[in-house]
Amino acid sequence: MKNIKVIYLESETCGLCHALQPRVEEVTEQEGIALEVINVTQHPEVASQYQVLTVPVAIVFVGEREFARQARFIDMELFEKQLQQAKEFAQMEDYPS
């Protein structure tokens, strides 16, 4: 199975970011998916790299490709479905990395 990871971009001044982060951590841990949390205030170059204009943002990657993205108001039910779909796609032999 190809690598699946989630990049969660947040800001220290974002209350919603801090409220959602524990739930994002819980779900990714349950699914066995790597999570990287990045503070865009401290690392604005990362926000630019991923074209992030608002936070929070959760980006799901399968291999090196972006598979799904949610920004601002993250629907946790949809996020869980996106992780399941990413796992299914990662198991497909013909899915490009």
Region locations from a protein language model:
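Active-site loop signature of alpha/beta-hydrolase-fold enzymes
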Residues: H43, V55, F67
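CheY-like receiver
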Residues: V46-Y50, Q82
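Non-catalytic, surface beta->alpha helical segment in thiol-disulfide oxidoreductase systems
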Residues: F61-D94
